[in-house]
Amino acid sequence: MEIIIYTMKGCGHCTRIKELIHRANVPYIEKKLDIDFTREELLEMYPKANGYPVMTVDGEFIGSLVESVKYFVEKGMVSSRK
């Protein structure tokens, strides 16, 4: 499973998604806005992206923080309680 998160500096939800992935105990790749990609490149790859963070799993667009939480809970990788 390859998880990639697209983040931007100063983004609180980006910090939270990294905490979520750590709870799931899975490796991930972080790509940072204006260092690893531009907003235009992200939208070209994932037109449904509408903010940060954006998470993909094996190239499949999952979404932002809320969708990512749902993904991990549905897969049984984290519980809905901390």
Regions found by a protein language model. Name each.
Residues V57-K82:
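Non-catalytic, surface beta->alpha helical segment in thiol-disulfide oxidoreductase systems
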Residues K32-A49:
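Thioredoxin-like thiol-disulfide oxidoreductase module
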Residues Y28-E30, F61:
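Conserved beta-strand scaffold positions in the cores of enzyme catalytic domains, especially
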Residues M1-V26:
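Local sequence-structure signature of Cys/Sec-based thiol-disulfide redox active-site neighborhoods
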Residues E2, L43, R81-K82:
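C-terminal alpha-helical interaction module
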Residues Y46-T56, L65-V66:
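Structural micro-motif
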